[in-house]
Amino acid sequence: MLLLGVVSCGEAMSGTPVTAVNTVTSGGGQAKSGEPDPSVPRVSNPKRLRGSDPCALLTQAQLTALGLPSANKAAQAQWGEAKCTWSGDIRATLSPDTKGRGLADYYARQKAFDNFKSSQVVGYPAVWADFAHTICSVMVGVADDQVLVVHVGSVSSRSKAQGNPCGYGETVAAEVLKNLPVGG
């Protein structure tokens, strides 16, 4: 299952990615004992993303602060869940991925991406994938079995994501995390 999504976010751009170590086991991301692969970071304070409307994950005030327009476009992600895109100087897409094995699915497929780096978003494990100067996909583990996929594309040189789309994606994800209820 290929999971792609992009979201971009606000002014504060943080995050120091570390190159992920390719330690996925022959069990496809699961340890042979059936326990989760120890190389995949666990979520210590899970949030509930499952069942959320991706177009309602950011408030109007957050959209404005992030430089995103109010208007959005709902569609379906490749894996069958809803996604929402905002397009202006920045194109940002939020795509919940709540039907798989969480970040373990991404770690198991890391060689399928052009590039892959581990990161964190306000204490939640995350990865950057397929990133370049103007685009980035940020996948944030909000629970061990739920991932917020944020895909960001910088459309204009006026964009807040210009030159750091992954940092912007992390900012967007941090704003979404503020709105998610506790629980897995």
What are these regions (language model features)?
Residues 1, 7-34:
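Short, low-complexity, disordered segments immediately C-terminal to signal peptides
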Residues 8-10, 54-56, 83-85, 135-137, ...:
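Sequence contexts marking disulfide-bonded cysteines in secreted/extracellular proteins
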Residues 17, 61-66, 91-95, 144-145, ...:
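Extracellular/mature segments of secreted proteins
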Residues 51-70:
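Amphipathic alpha-helical segments
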Residues 65, 69-125:
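Short, solvent-exposed recognition patches
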